[in-house]
């Protein structure tokens, strides 16, 4: 339960960052978040004209096979790294 509470707190805190992380950091965070919440990707890849949707899909797809616990822990670590880098 403590892991879930830490995850929820990290997800909340990362929304309060003073500066916007770069696209690579955001995609990494998104992929870990979706893997932690949903698990392996379960939607079709968006069309090639949906650049934002495709980038998000690819970020999530890269995390395929990662367990929920591992994705949750990795998300918390990445969020802490971004909080240290950008501040809240």
From Swiss-Prot:
PROSITE patterns: ACB_2. Signal peptide: none annotated. It comes from the Eukaryota. SUPFAM superfamilies: Acyl-CoA binding protein. Gene3D superfamilies: 1.20.80.10. It holds the Pfam family ACBP. Keywords: Lipid-binding. One of its GO terms (molecular function) is fatty-acyl-CoA binding. Residues 3-88 form the ACB domain. An acyl-CoA binds at residues 15, 30-34, 56, 75. One of its GO terms (biological process) is fatty acid metabolic process. Binds medium- and long-chain acyl-CoA esters. PANTHER family: ACYL-COA-BINDING DOMAIN-CONTAINING PROTEIN 7 (PTHR23310:SF51), ACYL-COA-BINDING PROTEIN, ACBP (PTHR23310). This is Acyl-CoA-binding domain-containing protein 7. It comes from Homo sapiens (Human). The lineage of its organism: Eukaryota, Metazoa, Chordata, Craniata, Vertebrata.
């Amino acid at each position: 339960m403590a892991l879930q509470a830490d995850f929820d707190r990290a997800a909340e805190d990362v929304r309060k960052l003073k500066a916007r992380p770069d696209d690579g950091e955001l995609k990494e965070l998104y992929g870990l978040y979706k893997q932690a919440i949903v698990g392996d990707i379960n939607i079709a890849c968006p069309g090639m004209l949906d650049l934002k949707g495709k980038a998000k899909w690819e970020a999530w797809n890269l995390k395929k096979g990662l367990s929920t616990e591992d994705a949750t822990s990795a998300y918390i670590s990445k969020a802490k790294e971004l909080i240290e880098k950008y501040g809240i």
